[in-house]
Regions:
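Secretory targeting and sorting signals
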Residues: 1-30
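Short, surface-exposed ligand- or partner-binding patches at beta-edge/loop junctions that are enriched
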Residues: 122-147
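Beta-strand elements of well-folded, non-transmembrane domains
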Residues: 58, 75-77, 127
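Hydrophobic core residues within well-ordered beta-strands of beta-rich domains
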Residues: 50, 67-69, 119
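Short, well-ordered beta-strand segments enriched in hydrophobic/aromatic residues
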Residues: 65-77
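The feature marks short-to-medium sequence segments in extracytoplasmic or secretory-pathway proteins
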Residues: 74-119, 148-150
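Low-complexity, acidic Ser/Thr/Pro/Gly-rich terminal tails and inter-domain linkers that flank the onset
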Residues: 37-64
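Cleaved targeting-peptide boundary
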Residues: 30-37
């Protein structure tokens, strides 16, 4: 009887350690990947995957509250389309600015890329009445921050 109780307690303790180990090893799903400007991040996209590189974040220079980022999208697999609407600029106070809608002559093309090809262009943010942004965030369709680029 004594041996049975010891074995039972040992089994419960071992199961507890296994669960604790699994929880400790699980990645934090809410934490976005943090990168410096100029680094790339691979992001799944409808039709494949894209390596995005955000190189800059700066005011347009026209004193109009518009900021821009230079972005390169390279198709890693399939024929994905860059999802420009998933980019946002963010300030240190958490103010978030959506990308401006509409095609721009120097904008990042919103069309499918063939595997291995890339496109480079600008994405623009309307920051007219807010705090200057310091980062660019890629937020998926579910509203989860996936990647944050900043200096």
């Amino acid at each position: 009887m004594q041996l049975s109780q010891i074995a039972q307690k040992s089994g419960v303790a071992a199961a507890g350690f296994v669960v604790a180990g699994m929880l400790a090893a699980a990645p934090a799903l809410a934490d976005p990947e943090g990168l410096d400007f100029g680094q790339k991040a691979e992001i799944p996209s409808p039709g494949g995957a894209i390596d995005y590189t955000v190189s800059t974040l700066e005011p347009s220079g026209h004193n109009d509250g518009v900021w821009y980022s230079d972005v390169t999208a390279r198709a890693v697999s399939g024929s994905p389309t860059p999802n420009i609407a998933d980019f946002n600029a963010r300030a240190v106070n958490s103010s978030t600015y959506a990308v401006m809608k509409g095609d721009k002559p120097d904008g990042l093309p919103n069309q499918p890329l063939t595997a291995g090809s890339q496109a480079t262009g600008r994405i623009y943010f309307d920051v007219r009445s807010g705090t200057a942004p310091d980062s660019v965030v890629y937020r998926d369709a579910g509203g989860t921050d996936r990647v944050v680029w900043k200096d």
